[in-house]
Swiss-Prot record:
Keywords: Ribonucleoprotein, Ribosomal protein
One Gene Ontology cellular component annotation held by this UniProt entry: large ribosomal subunit
Region (Disordered): 1-35
Protein name: Large ribosomal subunit protein bL32
Top-level taxon in the UniProt lineage: Bacteria
Family affiliation: Belongs to the bacterial ribosomal protein bL32 family.
InterPro entries in the record: Ribosomal_bL32 (IPR002677), Ribosomal_bL32_bact (IPR044957), Ribosomal_zn-bd (IPR011332)
GO molecular function: structural constituent of ribosome
Species annotation: Xanthomonas euvesicatoria pv. vesicatoria (strain 85-10) (Xanthomonas campestris pv. vesicatoria)
Taxonomic lineage of the native organism: Bacteria, Pseudomonadati, Pseudomonadota, Gammaproteobacteria, Lysobacterales
Name of the coding gene: rpmF
Example of a GO biological process term: translation
């Protein structure tokens, strides 16, 4: 088992943990549908930045 050579001070421990904080997910609202989605991801309807990018099952059923 690994054993440390010297004790880690509280400040050194805090410096190591300074990058462990969690951040909230960045959400965007689609301009055409108004749907909330993750940044740089398409919506469930297949829209990205206001344009239809991919045909989805729900849109294929509505077109028929």
């Amino acid at each position: 088992m690994a054993v440390q050579k010297s004790r880690v001070t509280p400040s050194r421990r805090g410096q190591r943990r300074s990058h462990d904080a969690l951040t909230a997910k960045q959400l965007s609202t689609d301009p055409t549908s108004g749907e909330i989605h993750l940044r740089h991801h398409i919506t469930a309807d297949g829209y990205y930045r206001g344009k239809k990018v991919i045909a989805t099952k729900s849109s294929a059923v509505q077109e028929d």
